[in-house]
């Protein structure tokens, strides 16, 4: 219902103005009275709007929460592997969930990217489009997702629901172990729908080129937003699998492309595939905007890889130049400052080179999409190969701290996320984490 401000102005101050005997019958008094009334009305209106945020947001127009007006985002990815490490009994789970939030706060984080859909499954008991995930503790005796969100809200921690959009199977979730009543299994044995799910190099994927796959993903996101109080939806880099120049690679969704050409499609196969991903992103973003939550994606950091014709097919230049696809993009900047390729040269994904590429892209596309960075806490204290005789991750303990400092110098990076929660607890990561915590206090 439309609010009537005139009827909401308190009467007592107006009565006082009207009874002011010193000014009532003089021109000066009349002017002062009018000015006082106008000043009061203005102050009241401003205080009313400030105290009624829901109405104030409606005045600004419908849409998602603004990233620009928020403080620096500091998030942690909580993956299906982290879910597997949680207690199986409800009370113990609830206690551990509270501890998770304490660990986030202690280390300067205020946002959780919580896995809710990793292998065409669902992590919430109130979700039905995809089957309940085997990775969730409790065997269905309670709702771990609901508890995690509840414990997060108690501590003022935002939760973004993390989806892997197309992946169906992996070494951790084999096809033969997927429930027979799963929508992907039903597709595979239903005439006319069997191409909704595709086998490629030993693993299964939802076909990005089929409307049924997009509709199922959208329905799953919608039911999550209907039933769980999350603040955002988050996709990572699992878009198209790598399709080589082999016949199998060409065939992945080539039949859909050929049908599209018969219907008037004029673009190349690469352009067609990019458009399929863009279509899904646009539909998800529209849903999120309608619900007032954020939507972002976290692709690989190498722009050359994203622009290739053999993998991902995320049209990064297109989505960065528009407000219609995502609210933020968070490249997975997991490599260090001295990363090298096999020839001993600076790698395209070396941190400063990659940071410069993303800053340039963000600026050249008019800053339509907020830029954030994913950081590789999981590498801290390890001898992970980075092209050097001895990995910088093994010899140094302030890499993430310096990465944040360099990103802040750009003036456009709006936040960070570290992968992953389990690494917050590892002894080898504590010095790196302590240094990161110190820069988060600034």
Where are the language model's segments positioned?
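Active-site-adjacent "subsite" loops/lids of carbohydrate-active enzymes
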Residues: 71-73, 77-91, 161, 166-223, ...
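The substrate-binding groove and active-site-proximal loops of carbohydrate-active enzymes
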Residues: 81-91, 129-141, 200-215, 266-276, ...
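Aromatic- and glycine-enriched glycan-recognition loops and surfaces
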Residues: 89-106, 133-153, 216, 275-282
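Catalytic domains of carbohydrate-active enzymes, especially glycoside hydrolases
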Residues: 95-120, 228
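Aromatic-lined carbohydrate-binding/catalytic grooves of carbohydrate-active enzymes
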Residues: 109-141
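Aromatic- and acidic-residue-enriched segments that line the glycan-binding/catalytic groove
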Residues: 125-136, 167-199, 238-262, 388-392
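Polysaccharide-binding and catalytic clefts of secreted carbohydrate-active enzymes
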Residues: 188-303, 307-325, 332-335
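Substrate-binding cleft of secreted/luminal carbohydrate-active enzymes
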Residues: 325-344, 369-442
């Amino acid at each position: 219902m439309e609010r009537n401000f005139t009827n909401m102005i308190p009467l007592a101050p107006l009565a006082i103005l009207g009874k002011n005997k010193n000014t009532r019958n003089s021109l000066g008094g009349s002017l002062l009275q009018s000015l006082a009334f106008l000043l009061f009305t203005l102050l009241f209106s401003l205080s009313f709007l400030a105290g009624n945020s829901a109405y104030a947001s409606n005045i600004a127009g419908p849409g998602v929460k603004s990233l620009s007006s928020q403080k620096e985002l500091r998030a942690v990815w909580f993956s299906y592997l982290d879910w597997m490490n949680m207690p199986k009994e409800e009370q113990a789970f609830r206690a551990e969930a509270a501890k998770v939030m304490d660990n986030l706060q202690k280390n300067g984080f205020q946002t959780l990217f919580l896995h809710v859909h990793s292998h065409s499954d669902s992590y919430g008991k109130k979700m039905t489009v995809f089957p309940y995930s085997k990775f969730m503790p409790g065997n269905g005796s309670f709702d771990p997702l609901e508890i995690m969100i509840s414990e997060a809200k108690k501590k003022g921690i935002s939760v973004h629901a993390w989806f892997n959009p197309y992946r169906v199977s992996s070494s951790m979730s084999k096809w033969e172990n997927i429930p027979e009543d799963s929508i992907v299994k039903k597709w595979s044995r239903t005439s006319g729908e069997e191409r909704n799910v595709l086998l490629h190099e030993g693993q299964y994927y939802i076909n990005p080129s089929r409307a049924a796959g997009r509709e199922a993903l959208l329905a799953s996101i919608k039911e999550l937003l209907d039933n769980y109080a999350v603040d955002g939806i988050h996709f990572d880099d699992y878009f198209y699998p790598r399709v080589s120049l082999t016949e199998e690679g060409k065939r992945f969704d080539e039949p859909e492309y050929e049908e599209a050409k018969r219907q008037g499609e004029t673009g190349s196969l690469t352009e067609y595939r990019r458009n399929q991903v863009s279509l899904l992103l646009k539909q998800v973003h529209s849903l999120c905007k309608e619900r007032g939550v954020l939507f972002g994606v976290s692709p690989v950091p190498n722009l050359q890889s994203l622009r290739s014709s053999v993998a991902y097919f995320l049209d990064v230049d297109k989505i960065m130049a528009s407000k219609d696809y995502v609210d933020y993009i968070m490249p997975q900047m997991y490599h260090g400052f001295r990363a090298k390729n096999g020839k001993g040269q600076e790698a395209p994904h070396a941190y400063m080179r990659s940071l410069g590429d993303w800053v340039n892209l963000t600026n050249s596309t008019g800053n339509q999409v907020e830029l954030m960075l994913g950081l590789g806490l999981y590498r801290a204290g390890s001898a992970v190969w980075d092209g050097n005789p001895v990995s910088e991750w093994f010899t140094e303990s302030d890499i993430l701290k310096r990465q944040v400092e360099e990103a802040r110098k750009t003036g456009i990076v709006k936040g960070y996320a570290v992968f992953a929660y389990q690494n917050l607890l590892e002894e080898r990561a504590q010095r790196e984490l302590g240094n990161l915590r110190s820069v988060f206090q600034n």
